[in-house]
Amino acid sequence: MKGNVIVGQSGGPTSAINSSLAGVYRTAIDRGAPKVYGMLHGIQGFLDEQYVDLSEHIRNDLDVELLKRTPAAYLGSCRYKLPEIHEDLEVYEKIFGILEKLEIESFIYIGGNDSMDTIKKLSDYAIVMGYPTRFIGCPKTIDNDLALTDHTPGYGSAAKYIGTSMKEIIRDSFCLEYSKGLVTIVEVMGRNAGWLTGASALAEGEDCEGPDMIYMPELSFDVVNFRDRVASLLEKKTSVVVAVSEGICTADGKYVCELGNSVDFVDAFGHKQLSGTAAYLANYIAG
């Protein structure tokens, strides 16, 4: 490796995101990269020329090991959506101007789907303009929904947390004196992918029967059928625990959380901020 490397972190930090950073840094150094830069606060910070020489901060093997176990995102993060090339050419010219100044051979971005969108746009521009820089996406998402990736770094720890939390909730529901007729609906992250909600099944074991029902966004949701199934379970059990993805939709494609209130806020990538699915369902079966 003759040229320099730059690496950034983007999106929500996972417990493994700094391990990926440590791996990128160590591999780049081992392959002979003269310098390994870290962009501060992702591509948004890079546009303001905020970056550091990582060798000044990661000085030995102990620092690498400590970085692996450091929480949050060591370099800082962002949720900045790159415009399309035809929408704002100046943004791309600025980015590639900085890359040329730093003599960057490889640009590595640690993140999920939106971060891969950034990598694709930069790669497309480089191909069109004939730049030799390589743009590489390093997978990171608790949603486990990156194409061609079996288990994304970040998913395992999130799945373990959900399974453990669900087991505690289920055990609590059976030890409460007033639990007869109690229905607990646990809303889990997952707009379009149900991997996290599915992980609630990890609660099942010798000491726990697991959630009674699990609803994921890959299948359409029927609120009437849900109410009837809860009622049927309560005829056999003193309490019911259900796991639902925040992004479950009815057959016509409407988010269940929007049945009660409209969702107005969207992020930089146009994603609606979903919340209230469990609250709506709780009110529905109670009413």
For the regions a protein language model found, what residue spans apply to each?
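Glycine-rich oxoanion-binding loops at beta->alpha junctions
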Residues: 49-105, 114, 142, 153, ...
